[in-house]
Amino acid sequence: MQIAKLLGATTTIAIGRTAEKLQMAQERFGADATVNLTREKLTDSIKRITGGKGINAVFDFVVNNESVENSTKILANAGRLILVGIGGEPAVINPKRLTFKEASILGTNVGSKHELRLLVDLARSGKLKGVANTKHRLNEVNEVLTALKAGKILGRAYFDPFLK
């Protein structure tokens, strides 16, 4: 959200299933709108938010069949789907939908060294708010991993080896 805004995105939309995470996306990271998949129909919400145009750039951080299918449905004409990282099972992509929309797909896992330098510069300048927001002792690793798997961690957890 933050980087998209800094690069000139006029409207950013966070999509997810957890009210707390969507609230964080809006309040902390500047999402203009949110779609809660447990309460709203994705395509209807995106049409309402975008005035029927769809989304120019969809960043899919889940990358599974459901997320890729949903992402291609909400893409605008000539939009770009950016697959970030890898999911568990290979995702099936409907080429007809992409061709009809003249959309494209880009896969990435980290970014280039140049992009990493830009990101570090943005963080140093104070223009980015950190995602790491819960500090833990090393002996809490099992509890933190359990909470992470259960989707109970908002943002990112990190371990401080000097924390007693």
Predicted regions and their residues:
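N-terminal Rossmann-like NAD(P) cofactor-binding module of classical short-chain dehydrogenase/reductase
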Residues: 56-59, 82
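Mid-domain Rossmann-like dinucleotide-binding core that forms the NAD(H)/NADP(H) cofactor-binding site
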Residues: 1-40
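ADP-ribose/adenylate-binding Rossmann-like module
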Residues: 75-90, 104-108
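Short amphipathic alpha-helix with an adjacent loop that forms part of the alpha/beta core around
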Residues: 41-52
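A generic alpha-to-beta junction signature in SAM-dependent methyltransferases
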Residues: 50, 62, 74-76
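Local beta-strand N-terminus motif with an aromatic residue
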Residues: 31, 54-55, 141
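C-terminal hydrophobic helical "lid"/dimerization subdomain
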Residues: 69-70, 77, 113-164
